Amino acid sequence: MLKKLVLLLTVGISTLVTAATPGTYFYGLNYGINPNACPSYEQIKGDFEKIQLYTNRVRTFSMSVCNQGALALQAANELGMNIYLGMWIDTPATFESEMAALTNVMQSGASFDKVDAIIVGSEVLYRKDTDENTLADYIKKVGQLVRPKGIQVTTADVYYEFPPVVVAELDFLMMNAFPYWEGVTVENGATTLIEHFNSAVLGKSLGKPVRISETGWPSSGPNFGASIASPENEKLYLSNALCLTRKNNIDMIYFSAFDEPYKAGVEAHWGIMNPDGTLKTDLSTSLFANPTC
């Protein structure tokens, strides 16, 4: 996640957007797993059924770890959900493992009709896991494998990490932005998100579509500058982010579906749901249906 102090943007607006209906509250939700306690197919399907109460689209992060790609695709297909299949590529060896897993799933005969795209890496340039030319090469190789079947290819990274050599290989861009890690007040969080989208990413997109792949606010944990983690602030940021992205016709995959207690500190508290799949106390479907900003 992004930990960069940048700008404060204060905009005072109050508006109501068109209400969403059950299953369409979010464009999508991010779904992570504990790699040290691999979930079964039944567990993944059960998680997806809970997610489906709020969206019909999910995004995963790895093909090979815990066989997540194959299991998640199977669950999504059975439930009729759309899915972004992620590839984790922190090293060359990991990329080869992810490519092998993706190839195996494609050769298995599984339907890819509900696959929105393959996401080749998550914040790899931000973390300096690889360089821009290597990432562009990875994206090209994945594209050669999946584009003949009509599947799009992209990468997800922080809003300032989209060099031209990478953008040239993408079908569309996916932007991560976490105003919490920028130390802004929650009141300025969602407007900061939209500012990054408009000023930082659209100008680098070469006219290609841009979507938000990760954003959110934690309900617990240490503060970061003026960013305060609390249930009330998670609620406010979520409402503002939903409202502004709908108002601006921006597709946003919210981070995240569930709290992840296997992670340390504040990283464990970004879900809209508790680990057992119950909605957090301060959140509600009425908020999701009618967010304000």
Task: State each model region's role.
Residues 143-163, 208-215, 251-262:
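Aromatic-lined carbohydrate-recognition surfaces of secreted/lumenal glycan-active proteins
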Residues 20-57, 64:
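Boundary/entry segment of secreted carbohydrate-active catalytic domains
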Residues 177-181, 206-234, 258-263, 268:
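Active-site clefts of carbohydrate-active enzymes
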Residues 116, 122, 157-196, 211, ...:
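Aromatic- and acid-rich polysaccharide-binding/catalytic face
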Residues 32-36, 41, 63, 68-152:
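Substrate-binding cleft of extracellular glycoside hydrolase catalytic domains
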Residues 223-230, 244-293:
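Aromatic-rich peripheral "rim/lid" segments of glycoside hydrolase catalytic domains that contact
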Residues 27-31, 56-60, 83-86, 116-120, ...:
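Hydrophobic faces of well-ordered beta-strands that scaffold small-molecule active sites
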Residues 20-23, 47-53, 67-82, 101-114, ...:
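Acidic (Asp/Glu)-rich catalytic clusters
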